Amino acid sequence: MNIKELVLKLNEIDAIKLGEFKLKSGIISPIYIDLRVTVSSPPLLAAIAEMMYQKVYKSGNAQETPALVCGVPYTALPIATGMSIANNIPMVVRRKEAKAYGTKQLIEGRFKEGDNVLVVEDLVTSGASVLETVRDLNSVGLKVTDVVVLLDRQQGARQALEKQGYRLHSVFTMEELINTLIEAGKLTGRTLELVQSFLDANRNVVVPLPPTLAPPAPAPIVINKPFEERAKLASNPMASKLFTLMSSKKTNLAVAADLTDKQQLLDLAESIGSEICVLKTHVDIIDNYDEEFIKSLKCIAAKHNFLIFEDRKFADIGNTVKYQFENGVYKISKWADMVTVHGVAGSSIVDGFKSGLKEYGSGLLLLAQMSSKGSLCVGDYTTQMIEMANNNKEEVMGLICQERLPSMTDGLVLMTPGVQFNSTGDAMGQQYNTPEYIIKEKNTDVIIVGRGIYQSNDPKSVANKYRTAAWETYQSKF
């Protein structure tokens, strides 16, 4: 089947509609292409899938051979399926929204990080739908170089995609479709005039992309500042205190003491206290907790000059977190120098901490990213957490993150969990990176090490090795 035959067949099955239609891009068009009807014509659907595949690969136009294909939801899904079956290429499916049950995945199917994916779409106007799919594929480690469509409406999609490094392949353009209909006598009179006027007015007019899909502004050049300088830039007093402590003690090592016995935790703190800047606790997992434990821990912290970080991960409304922070069995506000906070309740959660923070001088650490596999702290969520931190600098001392992003200001302490010399993972989804990689390549400030230290035979000696690796890597940046 050639292009002319295909266009006429689409017209025959009423896939080409004339009238007044509002496109996803917002443009009002006198012509609308509805390729959903092709699912009722299996031979035609198979022909479309094969023509699209040939356009990319059998003509040698592809940048890279795909390991997978993925259709943009929803019209392109049957096209991608036909392409997958006919050419024996595995397929992944992108959901428009993650399920709230089952696997809860946005991208379904078997794949591995770095696989190249051919994105399949029925037609493009601005390219927004394609870029939404590319964004979600990238979020799970998949790579995209090529996009194939049946129809390019010639209204900016090609430019938008190429600007972000993706090559667009189309079987035919809107101009070719219109010319075919004119030659076949299917488009005449007043309708022809309207369509022709529309094409003349909109040919290669770039439709603006939504802000979340527009090409990012160039990242500013990051000029690393030493901790003593950043202490002066911090609006939160605890952030300033931590920067100063790290600079004077020459350590940017935090240890996650995830132990369930209070004496074991106190012994660990005494053993490694001279090596660390922060000790991270989960007080609610301690089986034999009492107030004497807190008194002892504070004495050890004062003796060895480290701060206490309660990893509570508050996530409720402001009124509730106020009581969780200041009251109850643990009375966290009275002894924790810093606590972690999720942003799911919105920025109003910060208000719940204000009275306790003011009285005891502690700081909040917002969870912008996590080290666990499949974490939902990505994309827009991460962006909003950084914005929340920047808008509440007096209360927020820093971020829990996996990398420094341009919008993270110098007054925030960046702390990264999931650090081990052996950068692999565990059976429960934790993923590890080395101290050197986190401090130098990801450009964060504090490494958080847990089992790599407290499960070792000699925690103090191992802690010293992590301290040395992290501090020397930090110093090498200047």
From Swiss-Prot:
Residues 230-478 are annotated as: OMPdecase. Pathway: Pyrimidine metabolism; UMP biosynthesis via de novo pathway; UMP from orotate: step 1/2; Pyrimidine metabolism; UMP biosynthesis via de novo pathway; UMP from orotate: step 2/2. GO terms for molecular function: orotate phosphoribosyltransferase activity; orotidine-5'-phosphate decarboxylase activity. UMP binds at residues 258, 280-282, 316, 320, 371, 430-432, 450-451. It catalyses: orotidine 5'-phosphate + diphosphate = orotate + 5-phospho-alpha-D-ribose 1-diphosphate; orotidine 5'-phosphate + H(+) = UMP + CO2. Its EC number is 2.4.2.10, 4.1.1.23. One of its GO terms (cellular component) is phagocytic vesicle. This is Uridine 5'-monophosphate synthase. Participates in the last two steps of the pyrimidine biosynthetic pathway leading to UMP synthesis. Residues 211-229 are annotated as: Domain linker. Signal peptide: none annotated. Orotidine 5'-phosphate binds at residues 280, 313, 316, 320, 371, 430-432, 450-451. InterPro entries: Aldolase_TIM (IPR013785), OMPdecase (IPR014732), OMPdecase_AS (IPR018089), OMPdeCOase_dom (IPR001754), OPRT (IPR023031), Or_phspho_trans_dom (IPR004467), PRibTrfase_dom (IPR000836), PRTase-like (IPR029057). In the N-terminal section; belongs to the purine/pyrimidine phosphoribosyltransferase family. Transmembrane segments: none annotated. GO terms for biological process: 'de novo' pyrimidine nucleobase biosynthetic process; 'de novo' UMP biosynthetic process; pyrimidine nucleobase biosynthetic process; UMP biosynthetic process. SMART domains: OMPdecase. Keywords: Decarboxylase, Glycosyltransferase, Lyase, Multifunctional enzyme, Pyrimidine biosynthesis, Transferase. The active site is at 311 (for ompdecase activity), 313 (for ompdecase activity), 316 (for ompdecase activity). Residues 1-210 are annotated as: OPRTase. It comes from Dictyostelium discoideum.
